[in-house]
Amino acid sequence: MEDKFPSIVVSQPEIVAHHFTEADMVEPAINYWLKAGNLALSRSANAAVGHLEQGLKLIPGIDNPMLRNKSELLLQTSLGNSLRATKGWSTDSVKLAYTRALQLCRESGLDEHTFPAVFGLWTWNFLRAAFREAHALAEYLLNTAENLDDSVCKVLAHEALGFTLFAQGKFAAAHTELERSISLCEDSEAAAYLDLSAQDPRVHVRSYDAMTLWFLGFPDQALRICAEARRCADASQHPFSEAIARTISLRVHQLRGETAAVAGQANAAIAFCEEHEFVHYVAMALILRGWARAQQGEFEKGIAEIQEGLEKERATGALLFDSYSLGLLADACIKNKSYGQALEFLGQVQSRLDDENTERFYAAEIYRLLGETYLRSSHDLDQAEHYFSKGLTVAREQKAKSLELRLCLSMCDLYDLRKGADKGRSQLGDVYRSFSEGFDTADLVRAKATLERA
């Protein structure tokens, strides 16, 4: 069949795999189930899982122990990549697949296959918000990539470290790592990136760097690199990477305060992710559509949709961006004057903010929202100032200039009530003048108007 129908071998390896399975020819059957799984992943992750599980069923039929271990290792790694897309990046089944793959590497001395298994485990820990473990794995990946002097592995290792640093709120260091990853990316290596990590770093890294740039105070650069990520995703024709680009683009627009852009793009993002059954990104897009609805005055619908997305996300085991989602919920509640609800959601995050192993990229904004809640609900100026001051300390430590600007705006509102407007505007003016772009974004427009009232 391989010789008679070469086009089927290439385009539909599952047919060949089925024939070899029926003929009880285990080794070639497994080889073709693996090919079928890897090919299907670019179109349908669910189909990929089915093909790979068929291959795993045949593993006991291989007599040679080294070949048996290597075959299972390749299948388990690909299965982990496929399950990430269908079940969510941080489900237990994903961890089991990568852990088994790594165990087989170590038992059989197959060191050359260690990198993708460890990258998979880094992903699992990262999405679980276990950043101490994620950071250690990212450092291991970088050391391994340097020792191998492998450019593809270096791209992915810098990605892993950059993503982890971002989540920890170390934005300048994250940007350095992400820029390094982007600079090493080669279009000619696109297939190799997908084989190793089941995602396209040309898309994913740019998307994360866009968020990082916004926090660092470069909202226009953030939008530009986000557009680059979308172009890379369109060119790759890889659905999972397109889902990443679509949903993180929504997040960048949200950070820039562009409600209409989020509302206008969210439906298409949700439909695309639902079509391909990318549960993690469906949840993310629902959260952002809910935020947009709340901003547009549909408070009850918006809050309910953010909660729905958050529940879907947590059901996959993911805790990454949990503080961000709760922050969006609290923001919607504050605007709806539901201050008790806002404090309830913020309380879920507040207890974790002092732990260096937890998510801290949104810590300054959480403190600002706590201050806003006390300022608006009870005019408790002392408590509001306490949280605004804590937020400013964090924002300055993290070099999160965009969040520092928001906190200074909140401080201006506080000082207006205390009849100390000049002090608040002086502080705001210093931050405002440090920006070199983004003057048409909501926060900077508001800052300019506040300063002009002086």
Language-model features: locations:
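Residue signature of alpha-solenoid helical repeat architecture, marking inter-repeat boundaries
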Residues: 7, 14, 27, 43, ...
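Amphipathic alpha-helical segments of tetratricopeptide repeats
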Residues: 2, 37-38, 56-64, 99-110, ...
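Extended alpha-helical scaffolding segments used for macromolecular assembly and cargo binding
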Residues: 1-117, 124, 383-394, 398, ...
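Tandem amphipathic alpha-helical repeat scaffolds
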Residues: 18, 35-41, 74-88, 113-133, ...
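Structural signature of tandem alpha-helical TPR/SEL1-like repeats
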Residues: 95-99, 133-140, 264, 380-386
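C-terminal non-catalytic interaction modules
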Residues: 93, 100-103, 344, 353-454
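Eukaryotic tandem repeat interaction scaffolds
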Residues: 306, 326-334, 338-362
